[in-house]
Amino acid sequence: MSGNTLGSLFRVTNFGESHGPAIGCVVDGCPPGLPLDAADIQRELDRRRPGTSRHVTQRQEADQVEILSGVYEGVTTGTPIGLLIRNIDARSKDYSNIADTFRPGHADYSYWKKFGQRDPRGGGRSSARLTAPTVAAGAIAKKWLAQQHGTIVRGYMSQLGPIEIPFVSWDEVPNNPFYAPNAAIVPELEAYMDALRRDGDSIGARIEVVAEHLPAGWGEPIYDRLDADIAHAMMGLNAVKGVSIGAGFGSITQRGSEHGDEITPDGFLSNHAGGVLGGISTGQPVTVSLAIKPTSSIRVERRSVNRAGEPVNVQTLGRHDPCVGIRATPIAEALLALVLIDHALRHRGQCG
């Protein structure tokens, strides 16, 4: 009911606030016997960690994961896995000027309307800081999927604001702070972000996530379709305002003779469906595209109201991502992996 848990058989319950003592999650339903240590999880967390370039928030968090339970002698036991990440660089005083006001475009207003109170420090529960436990859980899912099925989940940025990023090579993705698959365009991205930071403003982005080498048959129609659960999970990522599978909204202009992926004895001739038909995986790569909105915490002064309903001008100080999409790629990968492992286990339970 509370909305803090993702999954049916592989369940992840997320907890914590941006400026609390710690954040973390409990992973319940991980199969026993998976080799796992903190380094497996830390590799993924380091890809998402803040303060790694001038283009992201300068909050300095080590994001060191602690495995509290569910692993013995380097192997999962099948019991709940507790993961903890301590907050070490919170600056709550940066938010004193907005404690009683609502940032335009932020969850400040809706959280207050729902709960009648809110934690203004760093956005509290609505902060993107809470994606770190998601990435930690996703690291476990990624490892199991790779070992059991050879499934690879990876992503990249395909657009930053008005700048489209042509895909060149997966090899380029880990070599720049944008997760851009094109080294030649990185200087343009850097110049754009430098100008944006000087303006005190923010921008959105588009992220692509792909899962390859998964079998056909995953997905539970009609209400737990694979693509429906993917969209559900992705919309749980802060700042996501749009999710498409395969050709997505491009399907509108395609004729059926183009959109329907023809099949030969050697396999499919295209993948407009994005690897999912009727809510079930086809064995083709699952392709997902995300639209990330601009960060709402900006230095540009904007109009809003306070808790008394009085008009105010809001300017957000502190340390914030001018484009949350820059660090969104490993988070989106984690969410896709979490959905896939859940459906893999559900399929195994029903169909063997």
Curated annotation (Swiss-Prot):
Its cofactor is FMNH2. Its EC number is 4.2.3.5. The keyword Transport does not apply. FMN binds at R125, S126, S127, N238, A239, G278, K293, P294, T295, S296, S297, R319. Reduced FMN (FMNH(2)). It catalyses: 5-O-(1-carboxyvinyl)-3-phosphoshikimate = chorismate + phosphate. GO terms for biological process: amino acid biosynthetic process; aromatic amino acid family biosynthetic process; chorismate biosynthetic process. This reaction introduces a second double bond into the aromatic ring system. NCBIfam families: aroC, PRK05382.1. This is Chorismate synthase. The lineage of its organism: Bacteria, Pseudomonadati, Pseudomonadota, Betaproteobacteria, Burkholderiales.
